[in-house]
Amino acid sequence: MVDALNLGRRLRVRSTAYVAGEPVPFFWPMRTFIHHNPLYGLEDMPFEQAVRRGAELFHARMFLPRSDYQRWQREGKVRPETLKEEIGRRSQDLPPVPGVDWPRWLHALMQTPHDRDAVVRGVRAKDVHAALHGHPPSAQAVDVAALLPELEQRLHARTLPEAVDALWGTGLADELDELVIKNCLDFFDEDQSAWRMPGRERGLFSAWSEVTRRNARMVLRRLHVRHILDHVQDAESAVVYVMEEMGIGAEAWPTYFTRVLTRLHGWTGFVRWRASAKHYYWAQQYPADIVDLLAIRLVMGLALLQESARHRGTPMRRDDLGAVVRERGAECVLRYALHSGEVLPDWAQRIDDTLSRGNGARCHDLLQRYWPLWQARLGQQQAAALRELAAAANATAALDALAPEDVEGLLQGLRDFAPQEGMVWTLAMEGQAIDKLLTQVQAPQDPPPDKIPFAQAWFCIDVRAEPIRRHLERVGNYQTFGIAGFFGVPVGFLGYGKGSESHYCPAVITPKNLVLELPAALDPHNEDFVSTLGHVLHDLKKSVLSPYVTVEAVGMLFGLDLFGKTLAPLGYSRWRRRIDTEKPVTRLLVDKLSREQADSIIRTLQRAMIVKALHTELKIERERVDDDMIRELREIALRRRDGPTRLRTTFGVPQTQEAEFIDKLRQVYGVDADYTNHQLERLGRIGYSLDEQVNYVHTALTMIGLTQTFSRFVLVVGHGGKTENNPYESALDCGACGGASGIVNARVFAQMANKPAVRERLAAMGITIPEDTWFMPALHVTTTDAIELFDLDLLPPRHLVYLERLRDGLRAASRLTAAERMPKLLPEAKALEPAEALRLANRLAVDWAQVRPEWGLSGNVYGIVGRRALTENSDLQGSAFLLSYDWRCDPRGRLLENLLAAPVVVGQWINLEHFFSTVDNAHLGSGSKVYHNVSGRFGVMTGSLSDLRTGLPMQTVMREGRPYHEPMRLIALIEAPLDFAGRVLERVVKVKSLVLGGWIRAIVIDPTQGYKPFVFNNGQWEERTPLIAPAEKEYSA
């Protein structure tokens, strides 16, 4: 019987599943690594509340062990005043206990030299009181019924397979993980595996169902999955059927679904992202969504429960499980103790033997003997911990004087504080970091208007740019700016020889415009070039044929002389091939096509397709037909005129064959009116209009405050990492460019800014760029510290004389940056000269065995939005995102809105990914690179089978087993009047909620109040001491 759901029930299943999956953040493919906040789905909660919820959902630790914070405290990185204030504030919410000075006890607790929890799990106050006073354990009979509510609560919080595992040690949940992961690998594979799941184009659940019905592995495992599938029609009906079979009511579905989906949150996050990525080729071809994944896991889980019920007698419905717990309470308490590991070691075998006999009376008798001993052991452990704590707090007498009910109050207070301790340490570290920053930044001074720097350089806001900017400014007359590394231009990019479009912009943006990369010297027979245009014009879902183009089409499209004369059809698989030769010099097609150009291109393409069709279908060679005949066939195929054609009179083609040929031109070769419109739409995406280019350049210049005093060179510096044998290579690239290198955006922006028509319009808007100012794209290679210049062949001849001076300055800054960076990677490199350090950086970047060619963005803590003059005299040691902004150029606050809504939010994602990857690398990071296995070309697993690893690898945030990154929330500093910044924050709702919710620590430095800092703390702005003014700066020519 197949259960078909009505529309209402179907929508309810889907909406419930979608909402249940929202706590799981998106996970992007590894080749475009996107930094993300692992708790993004919980950002509607205050930070402290969200970390508690995140710990439950992801079974993860949210703060580091106490000993790590104590080490930083010894190093002076913890603000003692904040520690004292937070302990005092939180002590007020703890239950009053006679003789217990909570601030003193909590301070002593945070200084204890171990990482144990303050309260032993499951301990009772009366047992602790007895142990403190040397009394024997209670001889009172164990009330089994009193133990069951807590047991039922723990089981109810789990999925049904997990609950059965907890009582019977069956391993169903792990087996279910294995089955789901294997099926996900088969379906989502992106041409890495030799075998892929058939029928994938029908969607995940449909393809999986067909394969599973015939899967011999299911039979060997004695799983009757086919029987379940016979009762369902699709994913939605499968979800309903399984939930009903397990006896779980609809009111419990949201919580249950969330537990199911967070079990493998990496795979869930990937499926969620993939379903939302409409541009992603693999998602278009092989669709899947969260309901498919949920249904597969539920169906497989039910099959495992049924198999366990048949062979072990375990329950397969939630109400049956509850009945077992109530009817066989003593047995279930013992089972849970044994399989959870919460058991006295010398009793484990005895309990196992008793359970294996299945005798209820024996279980009851054993529990009566065992449980008092277990509780006494817990009481003794807790008493010893309290005595140690009381001694540290100088309160031993107060502890001894506590009555049993007071001991309960003490334990409850310690329980209440336990999840807060990490937050207190974090606040104290952030307090120290804020104090440190406010002593480093200085009241900015504008340079004299007649002093023009030799060169200006725009860098990404990435923290790795801070050291090289600092060194570049100090080796010569350079002025640097910080801007999001996509330079404000969202780029859809089709690279030379690539088969698919990539997005070079923040993950929250979808670019409308497409830029093509084309060889500067075209080879008419070059298939890479053909595939570039072919991909633009042809929708892969409609046809696997690539168009055929001629020299004239290319001339009209690109303003170049050569293109191709006769080109062969290419399928998608061929488009993906790479020619293993050195990449030629290329140009970017940045300008919009006119309608006339687009029409001409399509006409030429269609003519070429007709020539090919004549040869392929009718064996008529090109030299036997003239242009008039080709034009006639095109007009008829486009339904602009009626037949017959000259094919009949010239070549004797029968009428029926002629009609078939015309139909093939339309259906197979794309010579069709509808497809023509589609081609025009695709061509319409190429390039940017003049208005768009002017807007992008004007916005960027205004945002960073560069509206006058332009240098001869303005470097537009993207960044990227170059490493070998590194699945996480894209994590070293530019997050603002979608996890790709920033050089594409740098080249696009420079080309726009150098265009005379753009400059003419900018001058009319009040920004005059001198004729001899040249915007030059460059790439900061963060793994080698080099700055590589691009498009030098376009450099005006009058600039060549200055080029070597520019390169000398860049090389000097690179060497100094390497000398600063190498000792952080390798302590033994501390004594290296700058040139030696640079050579070492280059060697590490190409070393296949090197698991850490750089620290990436580890160490990030600050986001500074303001003029460079605030920080130009500060050594921020690569800890700050530096965003250039001049509030005086932004009277309405629109530019600040954009900075807060995009770069600051992305900075917060980066910051919190490092935070959580550090505090629990096993669950929220990705573990050691040593055990990583690339999976399906889109992710990595640990070993051969695991959840997708979503965070940062251990080698990025840890050194020798200890945290290298210091987990603190982003401290965002804004240079602007307080009321002005406050109004802007009110308008940017997302950032406002992040600040109010404690996800971002905010500071405003008000230039209208003598550069007085205001720190947002506990819901209000706190005044701090005004900044000092820097010493007078000298400017060289």
Curated annotation (Swiss-Prot):
Cofactors named for this entry: Zn(2+)
InterPro entries for this protein: DabA
Subcellular compartments: Cell inner membrane
Residues annotated as binding Zn(2+): 460, 462, 719, 734
Keywords: Cell inner membrane, Cell membrane, Membrane, Metal-binding, Transport, Zinc
GO molecular function: zinc ion binding
Recorded topology in the membrane: Peripheral membrane protein
GO cellular component, one term: plasma membrane
Pfam families given in the database record: DabA (PF10070)
Keyword Zinc: yes
Top-rank taxon: Bacteria
Keyword Zinc: yes
Family designation: Belongs to the inorganic carbon transporter (TC 9.A.2) DabA family.
Main function: Part of an energy-coupled inorganic carbon pump.
Subunit field text: Forms a complex with DabB.
UniProt name for this protein: Probable inorganic carbon transporter subunit DabA 1
Organism: Nitrobacter winogradskyi (strain ATCC 25391 / DSM 10237 / CIP 104748 / NCIMB 11846 / Nb-255)
Gene: dabA1
